Curated annotation (Swiss-Prot):
Tissue: Expressed in kidney marrow.
Pfam family, one: AhpC-TSA_2
Protein name per Swiss-Prot or TrEMBL: Peroxiredoxin-like 2A
Database matches in Gene3D superfamilies: Glutaredoxin
Source organism of the structure: Danio rerio
Gene this chain is encoded by: prxl2a
Homology family: Belongs to the peroxiredoxin-like PRXL2 family. PRXL2A subfamily.
Miscellaneous note of the record: The active site Cys-77 corresponds to one of the redox-active cysteines of peroxiredoxins.
Keyword list, A-Z: Antioxidant, Cytoplasm, Redox-active center, Selenocysteine
Active site: C77
Gene Ontology cellular-component annotations: cytoplasm
């Protein structure tokens, strides 16, 4: 009887743990990024001659849609990048540019990511766009139902990837206004494959006042 009780207790604990892992209770809470915090982020160009710039240069006059890529080789990130790129014609009409930032430049990862992303890509070595409160998802991600649903969705859509580079620090998407408009949209990835709403991105981009 004692062994049965122990066995049932272990099963019950496992089930309770699985249920808990699929709630948001164990997830690190994000801290909103202020426009001043993001504006002072140090970025580097990747194409051609490397140069450094402050992030505010990306949106000061035209606003911007910026994807903070969790990992360029991740097939879920490639899926979201492709979907954001589908908005490029509409963003161009609005005069709002599309950019991405990555944490690191590993091998050919950025080059291989380019077919999925229609905007310019910058290096954010200090990972400012992943803060100010960095959020990580490790093994917990692989027992979350939502993550597996995201895996299946992207796989069925034909996306492929690899395991190169750091992929546990979660990313997000920002829509930045011009001048003093501030952050118009901040989407923080809560789990692997948690995509931003394209409708929300476009709605926020339409609020940008582009300087002529």
């Amino acid at each position: 009887m004692g062994m049965w009780s122990l066995g049932l207790g272990a099963v019950g604990a496992a089930i309770a743990g699985l249920i808990l892992a699929n709630t948001d209770f164990l997830l690190t809470k994000s801290a909103p990024a202020t426009v001043d915090y993001l504006a002072n982020a140090d970025l580097k160009t990747i194409d051609g001659d490397e140069r450094s710039l402050k992030a505010k240069a990306l949106w000061e006059k035209s606003g911007a849609v910026i994807m903070a890529v969790r990992r360029p080789g991740u097939f879920l990130c490639r899926e979201e990048a492709s979907e954001l790129s589908s908005l490029k014609p509409q963003l161009d009409e609005l005069g709002v540019p599309l950019y991405a930032v990555v944490k690191e430049n590993v091998g050919t990862e950025i080059q291989d990511f380019r077919p999925h992303f229609a905007g310019e890509i910058f290096l954010d070595e200090k990972q400012a766009f992943y803060g100010p409160q960095q959020r990580k998802m490790g093994g917990l991600g692989f027992i979350r139902l939502g993550v597996w649903q995201n895996f299946v969705r992207a796989w069925r859509a034909g996306y492929q990837g690899n395991m190169n580079g750091e992929g546990f620090i979660l990313g997000g998407v920002f829509v930045m206004g011009s001048g003093g408009q501030g952050v118009l949209l901040e989407h923080r990835e809560k789990e692997f494959g948690d995509k931003v709403s394209l409708e929300s991105v476009l709605e926020a981009a339409k609020k940008v006042v582009v300087e002529k």
